[in-house]
UniProtKB/Swiss-Prot annotation:
S-adenosyl-L-methionine binds at residues 36-38, 56, 80, 102, 109. The keyword rRNA processing applies. It comes from the Bacteria. It is found in: Cytoplasm. Belongs to the methyltransferase superfamily. RsmH family. Its main location: cytoplasm. NCBIfam families: 16S rRNA (cytosine(1402)-N(4))-methyltransferase RsmH (TIGR00006). One of its GO terms (molecular function) is rRNA (cytosine-N4-)-methyltransferase activity. One of its GO terms (biological process) is rRNA base methylation. GO terms for cellular component: cytoplasm. Keywords: Cytoplasm, Methyltransferase, rRNA processing, S-adenosyl-L-methionine, Transferase. This is Ribosomal RNA small subunit methyltransferase H. The gene is rsmH. It comes from Actinobacillus pleuropneumoniae serotype 3 (strain JL03). Specifically methylates the N4 position of cytidine in position 1402 (C1402) of 16S rRNA.
Length: 313
């Protein structure tokens, strides 16, 4: 077992916050407070009139946020898909100058064996971002069919051995009274089911990702947040999103591309470009940003991060 504990280092900290083009008197949302790296930097750029609202599903993130003694700051224990509801309750719909989302699982969540996210540390097989709601991974695996599990592994983990792994997991649970309940127990069953090992990647990597995404409805949450962002943002409001795997990044990229594209109009028609742009809700800001080699060296977990920024017209 790997006992190395990674200090939590906020990925693309300055790039993501710079992407918000902070207005000192603006109103901002950090949809994924985590351990507060982005939030604290945003607060440092705001005037006394500025405001920051943060959300997070993780009770431990909420506890960390409650240590911030700042009248400009407010934390709400909810998923970032509920940002429109939060804004409505606060009378801020259409008044938000920027939203930052840092997707995926954080280092403290991975490193805390009790959370059940890591296949490198033995702990209860939980995987819930919000430990107060829903089924744990162990509870779900105890009742899922092999077909449904294979679908989850294939869809959310792009796992090539999805059927083989699913069959092994479900068969094991059917054959014993004490179902799979520990992270390393599941990791070993997966490893035994995979015929070819990738020397650069643990055989349980994709399966753990897939189960975590499913348990937390991560892609549904992201889809809801993206679809509601335009109604929440003020004109010229920024969207700054960090993703860590191709499924998330694909969704963010397609959303920004779709909403920044004008109509295809035949050449020669007497229509001004400004008229065409009236109905285009977003403008993409720059190219996708990846971590520098220096950041990757300092924090290897940042390697797969991709930051995309867009602005509401």
């Amino acid at each position: 077992m790997n006992d190395t504990v990674h200090k939590h280092i906020t990925v693309l900290l300055h790039e993501a916050v710079d992407g918000l083009a902070i207005k000192p008197n603006g109103i901002y949302i950090d949809g994924t407070f985590g351990r507060g790296g982005h939030s604290r930097l945003i607060l440092s750029k705001l005037s006394e009139q500025g405001r920051l609202i943060a959300t997070d599903r993780d009770p431990r993130a909420i506890a960390e946020a409650n240590t911030i003694d700042d009248t400009r700051f407010q934390i709400v224990h909810t998923a970032f898909s509920a940002i429109p509801d939060v804004c409505e309750q606060l009378g801020l719909t259409g008044k938000i100058d920027g939203i930052l989302l840092d997707l995926g699982v954080s280092s403290p969540q991975l490193d805390d064996a009790e959370r059940g996210f890591s296949f490198m540390r033995d702990g209860p097989l939980d995987m819930r971002m919000d430990t107060t709601k829903g089924l744990s991974a162990a509870e779900w695996l105890a009742q899922v069919s092999a077909d449904d599990l294979a679908w989850v592994l294939k869809t959310f983990g792009e796992e090539r051995f999805a059927k083989r792994i699913a069959q092994a997991v479900v068969s094991y649970n059917k054959s014993v009274t004490d179902k799979i309940s520990r992270t390393l127990q599941l990791a070993q069953i997966i490893a035994d089911a995979v015929p070819f090992k990738d020397k650069h990647k643990h055989p349980a990597t994709r399966s753990f990702q897939a189960i975590r995404i499913f348990i937390n409805s991560e892609l549904d949450e992201l889809e809801k947040a993206l679809q509601s962002a335009l109604s929440v943002l003020a004109p010229e409001g920024r969207l700054s999103i960090i993703s860590f795997h191709s499924l998330e990044d694909r969704m963010v990229k397609q959303f920004m591309k779709k909403n920044s594209k004008g109509m295809d109009v035949p050449k020669g028609l007497p229509i001004l470009e400004s008229e065409l742009n009236k109905n285009i809700p977003l403008k993409i800001i720059g190219k996708a940003i990846m971590p520098s080699e220096a950041e990757i060296e300092a924090n290897p977990r940042s390697r797969s991060a991709v930051l995309r920024i867009a602005e509401k017209r």
